[in-house]
Amino acid sequence: MSTSKRKRADEVQWNKRSTKKKASAPPVKKTGGKADRPSLQIQTLLHSGDTMITVPSGGGCDLISTYARGSDEGNRHTSETLTYKVGVDYHFVADAGACRYSNRGTGVMWLVYDTTPGGNSPSTKDIFAYPDALVAWPTTWKVSRELCHRFVVKRRWLFTMETDGRIGSDIPPTNQSWPPCKRNIDFHKFTSGLGVRTQWKNVTDGGVGAIQRGALYMVIAPGNGVTFTAHGQTRLYFKSVGNQ
């Protein structure tokens, strides 16, 4: 005679429920990720019309980390800033003096970090200390050995411009056609990973005289005497860090 007993229906249902896995708790969301970080601030420097950049022989140097103290997005909110990214979007146009000749030149744009600015923006010769014989050849310029501890080239870009002895408003004869040349060009660059730290004095303006340490300049020089004007904008992506 069999000694096994038939299980009751309610007992079978109980065993099925007890063997089911317990629902796991939802994962705890970690803080401090990218989504929790404050977004970068943006400052845009517009150069058009009266504020266009004139690039003479020997080039020019302009401060671009011009963060005045304030509450807007483009202002610094603390005594220290970190510039991470820079975008430059410009249209270069050879000036009338350069267009009188048939010529070609390779120009250079640099982003230069100045560890200890002295209250005034330096000239290109202050940074590179080139001899006068090389003023028209910026591709040969290097930061002087004596000042390599102060000036650091963060980025360097080349561009080529051409002239053919004519200006843009000249009209060819009906039986001729003139080939195009690069008397006006578009120049677009975007760079990240700069990590430029700027410490500010206890003042509200954003000029070079307000910087205690760490200025960022945009330096442009024409090649072979093809001087020009620059129309466009520079956009800087930065954060306000440090103490209020």
Swiss-Prot record:
GO terms under cellular component: host cell; host cell nucleus; T=1 icosahedral viral capsid
Which Pfam family is an annotated match for this chain, by its short name? Gemini_coat
MF terms in GO: DNA binding; structural molecule activity
Write out the ranges of the annotated region (Disordered). Answer: 1-38
Alphabetically sorted, this entry's keywords are: Capsid protein, DNA-binding, Host nucleus, T=1 icosahedral capsid protein, Viral penetration into host nucleus, Virion, Virus entry into host cell
Q: Which cysteines are joined by disulfide bonds?
A: none
Q: What does this protein do?
A: Encapsidates the viral genome into characteristic twinned ('geminate') particles. Binds the genomic viral ssDNA and shuttles it into and out of the cell nucleus. Plays a role in protection of the genome from degradation, virus acquisition and transmission by insect vectors, infectivity, and systemic movement. The CP of monopartite geminiviruses is absolutely essential for virus movement.
Return the protein name: Capsid protein
